[in-house]
Amino acid sequence: MNRQNLAALVAAIAAIVGVGLGAYGLYRSTTTQRDLTTAMATMDASSAQNQVVADRLGIATLQPAQATDVANVALDPADVPPPITRTEPTTVQVTLTAKEVVAELADGTTYAFWTFDGTVPGPMVRVMEGDTVEFTLINDLSSVNGHNIDFHAVNGPGGGAEVTNVAPGETATFTWKALHAGAFVYHCAFPPPMHHIAQGMYGAIVVEPVGGLPPVDREFYIMQGDWYTAGRLGNQGHQTFSNEKALAELPEYYTFNGHVNALTKLYPLQAEVGETVRVFFGVGGPNKGSNFHIIGEVFDRVYS
């Protein structure tokens, strides 16, 4: 077992709810770190490690897949707001609705997503530098949880989260000015924010510079997420959120746009030879980063 895998295993065990810090502290009080390291190093490598992680994290037997509330939670990457053609700032009204829906995470595997507007990622918001944004967040009456929104493009406490806390059936509105051009993430920051993000509550906001971006032939909008499910990767049935795996940063799934097959089977990225393509890419997380690239192509320009 290499040091990296050992560290990941120790971190996973230390974070378990049910074993907890108290139990972990008790274990440390009777067994030295050297003893623990020696014992782990003598294990039969992969099988022993996998079994310990599985036992400690409580990998579950799945219930049957549930009926879905929406045909597809994955957002079509071609669903991008049109480029801004005006040259003067204006007031822009934006409304998003927090919706909790059951949909497929993979073929034959359902999951209870928390979303903005019923998709993962949430819709891309597109404004211009200098615009005044009147933003409204609606929490659908069918929701079970409270939600809010944190725009990383907002200069202010929590990116708006402090003034957009909404219980099911409630609405909140706040106004802010887009001061800096760039591509930014937005996400739910309702406590605990990690849980809300891990359920799919993230998206992107693009603040175009005055005068707009250079024209292109096609645009795509893609966000990566990591999913912490009680069952193993590939198990069919209804997956539920595992707080233990999230704390240990051990995701079972990584997706682009909320579904295992979002950019292949569901919405393959298509362009013609010679076209100029712009990709808006972000990482929802909550824990893992990305080195996004396209096999067979080299980006002409990367900017944020």
Give the location of each predicted region.
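Copper-binding active sites and cupredoxin-like electron-transfer domains
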Residues: 2-304
